[in-house]
């Protein structure tokens, strides 16, 4: 399954030699090991390791200095940045007012997206999120500003990716589609329409 995940990443994620990735996740976790060490190593991506606890302030400093092309993260990191730095700004009276005007709404949302992209270094292709469920409020916001993110699902025993989708085709609220060479069954009386556990 490690080989299958590596082949999938090399075939579908499209990162090139010399591009940059900041390693936020622990190497003791399969998600971090696979997608912040093995995949970047195989694709020739430069990996920058954070030697401190990845607090939002430290992450912001490192992203500004390294300007990564790929960001692999757990939801907690993204949620902290969005909940503490972005969502409070949207509660201001004039911002709420502008968001109710169709033309200004779109322009303001694109401006907000650009600011968030810059907060993550300004040149990444996407943020791949996994390891836990993404907060609904944060995901709804990211989708509304057309932020380049995707959410995958996996477990250690599967090497670790089970599902993933490119951010252009990713549907908010999902965890992507089954990765190549992976078979998935949903434990549900109606797996097409009723939520169930992935087996």
List each language-model region with its residue ranges.
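Alpha-helical architecture
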Residues: 24-27, 42, 133, 152
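Conserved AMP-binding/adenylation subdomain of ANL enzymes
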Residues: 3-20, 27-115
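Short, well-ordered beta-strand segments
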Residues: 20-23, 199
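Conserved AMP-binding/adenylate-forming
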Residues: 71, 108-199
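A near-ubiquitous, low-amplitude feature marking generic local secondary-structure context
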Residues: 23, 64, 99, 125, ...
């Amino acid at each position: 399954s490690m080989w299958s995940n590596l082949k999938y990443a090399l075939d579908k994620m499209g990162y090139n030699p010399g591009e940059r990735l900041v390693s936020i996740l622990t190497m003791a976790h399969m998600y971090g090991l696979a997608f912040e060490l093995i995949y970047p190593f195989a694709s020739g991506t430069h990996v920058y390791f954070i030697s401190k606890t990845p607090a939002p302030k430290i992450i912001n400093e490192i992203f500004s200095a390294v300007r990564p092309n790929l960001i692999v993260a757990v939801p907690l990191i993204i949620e902290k940045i969005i909940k503490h730095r972005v969502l409070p700004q949207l509660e201001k009276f004039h911002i709420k007012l502008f968001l109710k005007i169709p033309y200004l709404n779109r322009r303001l949302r694109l401006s907000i997206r650009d600011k968030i992209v810059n907060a993550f270094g300004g040149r990444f292709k996407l943020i791949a999120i996994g390891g836990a469920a993404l907060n609904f409020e944060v995901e709804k916001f990211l989708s509304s500003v057309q932020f380049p993110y995707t959410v995958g699902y996996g477990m250690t025993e599967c090497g670790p990716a089970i599902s993933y989708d490119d951010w252009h085709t990713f549907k908010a609220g999902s965890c992507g589609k089954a990765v190549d060479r992976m078979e998935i069954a949903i434990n549900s009386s109606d797996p097409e329409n009723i939520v169930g556990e992935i087996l």
